[in-house]
Amino acid sequence: MLKLIEDAIERTSAAPQASAPEVRTQSDIDEELKKLLEQIQAKIYVVGVGGAGCNTINRMMQVGIQGAKIIAMNTDAQDLLKVRAHKKILLGKELTRGLGAGNNPKIGEEAAKESEREIREALEGADMVFITCGLGGGTGTGAAPVVAEIAKKMGALTVAVVTLPFTVEGIRRIKNAEYGLERLKKNTDTVIVIPNDKLMEVAPNLPIHMAFKVADEILVQAVKGITELITKPGLVNLDFNDVRAVMKDGGVAMIGIGESDSEKRALEAAQQALNSPLLDVDISGAKGALISISGSDVKLEEAQQIIELVTSKLDPEAQVIWGIQLDEELGKMIRILLVVTGVSSPYSVAEEEEESYFGEEERRPIKLDLDEL
């Protein structure tokens, strides 16, 4: 066995021999296989809704996400113009005239309903739809649940990845966020919740504008980590059905992120992910978990240590899936993204309270005639 391992390492390291026969890489069968793979590859769409969602989309386009179509949706024409995406949709052209939703989720909701046909066309053929937004404002809070409802009715596995506002942003945004979260829970398979306040525990001295950037980065890593386990060749890949099994009807999900480059990097990274302030819930009753392991030289033994540690914290009946992605930029570091689904969530509000969230400040959707201004 040792010799077999040594031979495998030697073949990997050795330079190709000049006398080796040339291999045809563009044969007819290769082309047929490529076409077949294109047909059976899961179609994954990532939709950023509202200002925060579109900021996340910009970051995704910057870092790159393999095998996903990126769509930006907003009621603010000026903000939408600045976004890089494969497709853009200005929501509620007649209702808002591109001026935004004014922090009113009701306007965001009506704007998305006005643009339902465009949304349906943009999501046509999707197997999985990620919806990213920051809850608390008008467009993301109001429109994201409408987009989610459309995607789910079209048969796509629908996963929202959302941030909750910092406490310092005020009670109105917090109440708006609670309203939006309840509606998303009804219209998605899984909602991954990232409470911004928890970032203060990770980096308490972070300036507020940088804290928002960190929140964007966590959203990006969550979506990218899950997507590329399906779409990007790696040491251990998942297929779409694996992910569907864990995320379908997954309810509220939380994430933990850990990384380490020490001698015991695998265990330390796993422990960090499990103890992450972002994962500040009891996971013992969770329905499932997805573990994404990244590194330039992850060993099989290290992967085993990570899986065993995580599964030891979960219900024995929980469904756990995992994959390994090669990332040369991490050097000697191992990074773990842990997504735990079906957790008991503190982010629930009574259904009968929903209509009172906007109070006296609520504004009804209006049409603006700019020619009269």
From Swiss-Prot:
One of its GO terms (cellular component) is cell division site. Keywords: Cell cycle, Cell division, Cytoplasm, GTP-binding, Nucleotide-binding, Septation. Pfam families: FtsZ_C, Tubulin. The keyword Membrane does not apply. SUPFAM superfamilies: Tubulin C-terminal domain-like, Tubulin nucleotide-binding domain-like. Residues 354-373 are annotated as: Disordered. Gene3D superfamilies: Tubulin/FtsZ, C-terminal domain, Tubulin/FtsZ, GTPase domain. Residues 360-373 have a biased composition (Basic and acidic residues). GO terms for molecular function: GTP binding; GTPase activity. GO terms for biological process: cell division; FtsZ-dependent cytokinesis; protein polymerization. It comes from the Archaea. It is found in: Cytoplasm. SMART domains: Tubulin (SM00864), Tubulin_C (SM00865). Belongs to the FtsZ family. Homodimer. Polymerizes to form a dynamic ring structure in a strictly GTP-dependent manner. Interacts directly with several other division proteins. Essential cell division protein that forms a contractile ring structure (Z ring) at the future cell division site. The regulation of the ring assembly controls the timing and the location of cell division. One of the functions of the FtsZ ring is to recruit other cell division proteins to the septum to produce a new cell wall between the dividing cells. Binds GTP and shows GTPase activity. This is Cell division protein FtsZ 1. It comes from Thermococcus kodakarensis (strain ATCC BAA-918 / JCM 12380 / KOD1) (Pyrococcus kodakaraensis (strain KOD1)). The gene is ftsZ1.
